[in-house]
């Protein structure tokens, strides 16, 4: 690792956010308020089961009411929508999360839009997307992964990114597009690119802040990185291990070994963005509980970008 490269520990930052969430939850409980999180999982996909279990454990650790609804793979879409309607009407539930992906016979878009915007802690409802796109961050729920990435960026650069060039590689509705909007709100000059962008490496070399969220293992090579840049690697890819024996290992979308010799700051995979996603899910659930009960919502961004 270069002497000047800072390793951004998402685990440490996530732990500090969880500590804040716990403290605010204790304060709410003094007023008889317990944040409630309901997670819906359809089918028995092993990866989804692991994700849901980790979210449930973290919610309980934070002192939340944590409820899991497990539905069979062949559940009718109507039944899923009815469950969401009942959770929308349940005052003890402040956040609703539907674990994706859903089976093919279920319209994921319809399901996401059925969640009340006030309980849409994933930030996928059109109303929350629109608020983020127009800069109404005070009342928007921001998708958890870009929200976490933004806090990591703030830890390096502060809340005002004026004069800095940011390149987001990835155009998904879950990470790329909301990430670009958050960077714009912080006054960065933003370019959003993707795997089909011409001369992508040239764009990346101009970035003071480089966000990699394209889902291709080690696509961003070290010589694409501007010396001293901040690199946030959102990718989580499982590839064959360098050792024999058929083992696998996790890598990001960035060539990490090369990046640490060139970047000013970089997130590792694992241990970078991943822990931040769950931490921000807990933060959004807490904020939803505060809003539902006319309580002041806490700050989680270093400069109040996320409230």
UniProtKB/Swiss-Prot annotation:
InterPro entries with a match to the protein in the record: Aminoacid_DH-like_N_sf (IPR046346), NAD(P)-bd_dom_sf (IPR036291), THF_DH/CycHdrlase (IPR000672), THF_DH/CycHdrlase_cat_dom (IPR020630), THF_DH/CycHdrlase_CS (IPR020867), THF_DH/CycHdrlase_NAD-bd_dom (IPR020631)
Which Gene Ontology molecular function entries are recorded, alphabetically?
Answer: methenyltetrahydrofolate cyclohydrolase activity; methylenetetrahydrofolate dehydrogenase (NADP+) activity
- Pathway involvement? One-carbon metabolism; tetrahydrofolate interconversion
Q: Name one GO biological process term.
A: methionine biosynthetic process
Gene Ontology cellular-component terms for this entry are:
cytosol
User: Which superkingdom is the protein from?
Assistant: Bacteria
Binding residues for NADP(+), per the UniProt record? Answer: 170-172, 195, 236
Please list the reactions this protein catalyses. (6R)-5,10-methylene-5,6,7,8-tetrahydrofolate + NADP(+) = (6R)-5,10-methenyltetrahydrofolate + NADPH; (6R)-5,10-methenyltetrahydrofolate + H2O = (6R)-10-formyltetrahydrofolate + H(+)
Q: What are the record keywords, sorted?
A: Amino-acid biosynthesis, Histidine biosynthesis, Hydrolase, Methionine biosynthesis, Multifunctional enzyme, NADP, One-carbon metabolism, Oxidoreductase, Plasmid, Purine biosynthesis
- According to its UniProt record, the EC number is 1.5.1.5, 3.5.4.9
Could you tell me which PANTHER family the record lists for this protein? C-1-TETRAHYDROFOLATE SYNTHASE, CYTOPLASMIC, C-1-TETRAHYDROFOLATE SYNTHASE, CYTOPLASMIC-RELATED
What family is this protein classified in? Answer: Belongs to the tetrahydrofolate dehydrogenase/cyclohydrolase family.
Q: What does this protein do?
A: Catalyzes the oxidation of 5,10-methylenetetrahydrofolate to 5,10-methenyltetrahydrofolate and then the hydrolysis of 5,10-methenyltetrahydrofolate to 10-formyltetrahydrofolate.
**How is this protein organized at the quaternary level?**
Homodimer.
Name assigned to this protein: Bifunctional protein FolD
Species in which this protein is naturally found = Sinorhizobium fredii (strain NBRC 101917 / NGR234)
């Amino acid at each position: 690792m270069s002497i000047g490269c800072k390793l951004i520990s998402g685990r440490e930052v996530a732990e500090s956010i969880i500590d804040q969430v716990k403290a605010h939850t204790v304060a709410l409980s003094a007023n008889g308020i317990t944040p409630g999180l309901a997670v819906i999982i359809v089918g028995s996909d092993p990866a989804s089961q692991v994700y849901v279990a980790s979210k449930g454990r973290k919610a309980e650790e934070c002192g939340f009411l944590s409820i899991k609804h497990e539905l069979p793979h062949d559940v009718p879409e109507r039944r899923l929508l009815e469950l969401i309607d009942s959770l929308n009407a349940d005052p003890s539930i402040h956040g609703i999360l539907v674990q994706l992906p859903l089976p093919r016979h279920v319209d994921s878009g319809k399901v996401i839009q059925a969640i009340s915007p006030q309980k849409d802690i994933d930030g996928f409802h059109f109303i929350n997307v629109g608020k983020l796109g127009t800069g109404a961050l005070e009342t928007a729920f921001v998708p958890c992964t870009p929200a976490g990435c933004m806090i990591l960026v703030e830890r390096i650069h502060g809340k005002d990114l004026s004069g800095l060039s940011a390149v987001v590689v990835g155009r998904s509705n879950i990470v790329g597009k909301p990430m670009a909007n958050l960077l714009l709100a912080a006054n960065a000059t933003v370019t959003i690119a993707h795997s089909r962008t011409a001369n992508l490496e040239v764009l990346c070399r101009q970035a003071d802040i480089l966000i990699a969220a394209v889902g291709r293992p080690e696509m961003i090579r070290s010589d694409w990185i501007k010396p001293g840049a901040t690199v946030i690697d959102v990718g989580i890819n499982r590839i064959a291990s360098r050792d024999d024996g058929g083992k696998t290992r996790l890598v990001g979308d960035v060539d990490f070994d090369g990046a640490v010799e060139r970047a000013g700051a970089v997130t590792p995979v694992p241990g970078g963005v991943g822990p931040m996603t769950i931490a921000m899910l807990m933060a959004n659930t807490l904020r939803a509980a505060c809003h539902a009960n006319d309580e002041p919502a806490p700050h989680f961004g270093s400069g109040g970008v996320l409230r």
